Amino acid sequence: MGSSLRSFIKDVRGAKTLADERAIITKQSAKIRTKLRDDHLPHEKRRVNIQKLLYLYILGEKTHFGQVESINLIASDDFVDKRLGYLAATLLLDESEDLLTLLTNMLNNDLHHPNKYAVSLALTSLGFLSSPELARDLYPDVENIIKNSRDPFLLKKALQCAAKLIFKDVSLLEIFNIEDITKILSSHSICTHGVLLGVTKIIQSILLIGLNRKKDEDEDEDGIDYSNDILSPLSLLLRDFFIRLENMNSKNIEPGYDVQGICDPFLQCEIIYTLKLYFQVGELLNSNNVLDYKDNFCDLLTRIATNTDSTKNSGQAILYETVKTIFSLDLNQPLRVLGINILAKFLAGKDNNTKYVSLNTLLKVVPQEPTAVQRHRKFISHCLQDTDVSIRMRALELSFAILDDSNLVELVNELMKFLAKQDEDSKDLIIYTIDHLIDTFDTRVVKDESWKLDVFFNILKLVGSFINYEKINDILIIINNTSQLSDKSEFLRKMLTISLNGTSAEISEENIGWQLVLIWCIGEYGDLVLNEGNKNGADIINESSITDYLLTLQELYTATNLKIINYILTAALKLSVRFHDAKNIEKLRQLILSYTDSTDLSLQMKSNQYEIFFNQSISVKKIILETMPKFEKITEEQDNGKALSKNLISNEPVDLLSDLLGEDSKAESKASTGDNVKPIDILEEIFGEKNDIAQVPKNANKEESINHSSAVEANSGVTLPLDANKIYDSSSLNVYASLLSANSGLAHLDLYFQAKSLISDLKTFCAVPKAQKLTLGQLYPSSTINASQICKQSLKISGSGKLKLRVKLDFHLNGSSSITNEQFDHKFDETL
């Protein structure tokens, strides 16, 4: 093993096994540790060992034992040692290390070093490693360089270092002098592109500090009046940035900054980003000094977007920054459409990085311009066929984001083509597509139910093995709720034709989704297929073939999947009242009896229960084993601020037999105990996989109150409920809150706004903690409220933590053209 860095790297790369590599690294690490302890080690060998230490750092090994030695190298007068020491310190230390205190004096000395490259090293390291204490101690030295240096190289480094220091310690804004920046910009001899980059960095740090301040706390605890002392002087630089950006975007390219025919794209991107921060802070603080330039900025962005070459990487970088700025500031609609067209050009290109960036950005801007994004559906569909899995995933997410009633059929057909081409390696993409397709049909009303069932038929056939039981449950609900019996019958006929004839090889044993849905449909609608006549496959679909198929599945899955066996038992019981041939009915009875002594307790219990059912008279069985009624899901109505659905479910145990027989349960309603609301699983209810029927809570008094409140609203406008609490009071309006429910992870509440004077164009903006998600309903009955009248808004909050709400209100008072702003916070006693 050689002693040089090169030989060490060669030995590590040449290791044939992981154990050999580990042995080489461990041995070399021990040697380095030993040699660094030697006070008499020559500088040259000490330098080599630090180089090896940095290589160990790159490999992810522990290097803490070399931190002090790195600092010692910085103190050397030899520039080579100093450079290596600063590099090692930058990599091996961070701002939390106590060793940083040892650096203070060394950095201070090097900041006054006669060699500008030594000063540059100190500035770079200080920017990387600065802690708030180090920033306060050494900022005056950095400021001195900014004030007095005429060297563009040092100025560039000093400005970027100052940007890091100011962002690290906000109190430095008190001593920061914006006139220094103005002087630099006005001096053509030192204001090179590198210095301009430094200027943009320091302004970005100052503006980001402003963004982090609350709007109603203009004068912070550090005593700085940000709007007047900082933003107003900074706004004087806006015109200069506009001129420089416009000049760079013109055809007058300086050869020294030409990148693929574009003038310094790095600086252009930084200036655009800086201007974006200007206007974000200006809007936050309502600064006219900044906002007066907004129209000019829109015009400039339009010229940049139009003139920049989108075929080159450098041009794409500028255009991407332009698009981000357009949507971050929510500029006018023509600019937003222009931005989306730029992203569509990126999609049409061949570079995968550009495609990914475009898809990711389009996904974020869909809520702002959904129609404009939908126009480029062709490019999005092409990305679904890309070889890069990350691009396919982003294209999938975007496809579902733009899906609506107008393009439902076209997009779903595209997604079905996508599923047909996937293999098992694309499992994540398949599962994502299936889940979102099922959710789409679950939440949207599709008029063509036959087409909808065809989609599910193809999903089950292509990728049924990837569908989890929860989504199978949703599919069965959708099938069950299909209104036309002929559509259900045709759906089952197609499934049976494939499973019973010679093409059954199309469906593998692993396709559990197909088998579960088919077994359930056989039990529910087997008589429909038989009664309507066998139009297609008349010799295949009959009572005997269906019975034999169930027996085949029983043999196939007895040892591997008890869930399917549960479904088979229920299907056999239901078919006993749908079949007429005694021989087949007896086979079904024997199938059920075969599990009366099963080692699985739940299966044994079910089999014995079903045997008792089986022996009942046909008239009793027909009533009990009727086809499932339409399944109603519990949903919330937030459209136009409507109250929760009146059909609240009782927390009494569900009497399944009484429910099937159509009898009303007369058990007294108990008060809610706050248990989690649990949705009824249609599969478990039918196939009896659990002994206990699901119970869900209900507050009878609250139901009566809600129903009464809804009736009052329908007849005479919104009125305050008795349990509403006042959470805000001002000279313009009162705000009340009524907490409808606050179960584990989910809360529903209504806000009531009572006007004291005429309020028009009321807009509400609500925020919750990061661990929670808020869904906001519309104002009902109107956003205009006369004096003493009330409007209502429904809120749904999900997540975890203490229930807290921040509400901001914008409105016009008494017909005034000016907008009144009010804001308040409220903490509820409940916890999600």
Curated annotation (Swiss-Prot):
Single Gene Ontology BP term?
Answer: intracellular protein transport
PANTHER family assigned:
ADAPTIN, ALPHA/GAMMA/EPSILON
Annotated localization? Cytoplasm; Golgi apparatus membrane; Cytoplasmic vesicle, Clathrin-coated vesicle membrane
* Keywords attached to this entry: Cytoplasm, Cytoplasmic vesicle, Golgi apparatus, Membrane, Protein transport, Transport
In terms of SUPFAM superfamilies, this protein maps to: ARM repeat, Clathrin adaptor appendage domain
Q: How does it sit in the membrane?
A: Peripheral membrane protein
Q: What does this protein do?
A: Adaptins are components of the adapter complexes which link clathrin to receptors in coated vesicles. Clathrin-associated protein complexes are believed to interact with the cytoplasmic tails of membrane proteins, leading to their selection and concentration. The AP-1 complex interacts directly with clathrin. Component of the AP-1-related (AP-1R) complex, an adapter protein complex that mediates sorting of cargo SNARE SNC1. In contrast to the APM1-containing AP-1 complex, AP-1R is incapable of sorting CHS3.
* Keyword Protein transport in annotation: yes
This chain belongs to which protein, by name?
A: AP-1 complex subunit gamma-1
The entry lists its GO molecular-function terms as: clathrin adaptor activity; clathrin binding
Q: Which gene encodes it?
A: APL4
Q: How does it assemble?
A: Adapter protein complex 1 (AP-1) is a heterotetramer composed of two large adaptins (gamma-type subunit APL4 and beta-type subunit APL2), a medium adaptin (mu-type subunit APM1) and a small adaptin (sigma-type subunit APS1). AP-1 interacts with clathrin. Also a component of the AP-1R complex composed of at least APM2, APL4 and APS1.
Q: Any one cellular component term from GO for this entry?
A: cytosol
Where in this chain does the record put each GAE domain? Answer: 733-832
Q: Which miscellaneous remark does the UniProt record hold?
A: Present with 4850 molecules/cell in log phase SD medium.
